[in-house]
Amino acid sequence: MDAQESDRAWPAIMRSFTLLLLFASTNVLAGEPALLKVMTLNVAHARSDGPSQLFQSEDQAMLNLWKIVDVLKREEPHVAAFQEIDKNSFWNGRFNHAEFLAERANYPHHFSGAHIDGDNLEYGTALISRLSMKETTSVKFDRPFARPRKGFVVSTARWPESNNIDVDIVSVHFDFLRRNQRLKEAKKLIAVLEDRSNPRIIMGDLNSDYGGDNQLIPLLESSLGVSTWEPHAEIVTFPKLQKRLDWVLVSNDIEIVSHAILSDTLSDHRAVVAELRLLEI
């Protein structure tokens, strides 16, 4: 192509480029909400896959948390939910682990709930977010016999690139031992959420798989109008027992577009990452 032909072709090239830009930005111009990416992980008190947080140093706990920071930077979820995460505990350094993760992975917002608070221990569930959070609440479940109390945190965030649509986001941890205790805890979660009108995302270590005698997730589905990604699929998030204990549940006005279990060894659980689409409301 000589210079004259190049000059003649240039306007056509520019028109094509302009059309491509217009096509790529159609969703934004039309005000269609962006995908919302979320992650959930049981941090296991920053012990990674070690036997106990009692047998490691504060430096080792920080190194394990840095691994989570690296994954957050790689995956870039808008919001991450954590369970078994410490705020001020003697066994892993007496510092706020959610704050540590948020600051180092560039998440400007974080909120932690201490469901255990006493005997030099303070830990529970947490959320970190790149979206502003409001109306943050921490709820403790009733303490079962001879084991730690569980609970959840809930916060409201604005769905990115939406027309002022708020979404309620939950990080929850249910009892590990008894089904009846988990059902009692689920009913308390339902009581808190059922009167809230926002779309909802529930994430966490539910300590339950799906089907058979496990009625926990079906109870949440029927009571809160939530669903999950391929509930009967053979997905493993807790390798030790080869079970799916960690879940992302969304209300019926949200679609799970993608769902992945990360292979990184960050704790005895595997992190779950999902991309969500807000349907028309």
Regions found by a protein language model. Give the residues of each.
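N-terminal, active-site-proximal structural segment of metallo-dependent hydrolase catalytic domains
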Residues: V28-R104, D117, K187, L279-I281
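Structural recognition of the beta-strand scaffold that forms the well-ordered cores
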Residues: T40, V79-A81, F111-S112, D168-S171, ...
